[in-house]
Amino acid sequence: LASSAASDVYKRQKEEVAYQDGQIVSKTLAQNDAVSVTLFSFAKGEEISTHASGGDAFVTCLDGVGEVTIDGEKFQLTEGQSIVMPAGHPHAVYGKEQFKMLLVVVF
């Protein structure tokens, strides 16, 4: 039962942000001084350029194929895979294909 409930939440998250040609779409689920939780959808070829964050960022791929670059090293993410982008380290996110992700930043 717990697995089924988790699966339902995961499916609903994927449906919260639609793909739009040539765009990155985001939806903030929660934000305060300690944490930020945001859903993103990337059209193929769209990118959030290199920047650094003041908090540790945890990314989970919800759909598609994305590429995360951290300190110049590239990592490919597919559905269900996650990665941590450490605070203060330069990173970028790119939609190799259409790509949806959940971003949790802890400050």
Q: What is each of the regions a protein language model found here?
A:
Residues 41, 54-68:
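Short, conserved beta-strand element in jelly-roll/cupin
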Residues 15-46, 104-107:
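A short glycine-rich, His/Asp/Glu-containing loop-to-beta-strand
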Residues 72-87:
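Short acidic-glycine-tyrosine-enriched beta hairpin
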Residues 62-63, 78-79, 97:
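A cytosolic small-molecule/anion-sensing beta-strand core signal
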Residues 87-107:
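Ligand-binding loop in jelly-roll beta-barrel domains
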Residues 1-6, 10:
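Single conserved hydrophobic/aromatic residue that forms the stacking wall/gate
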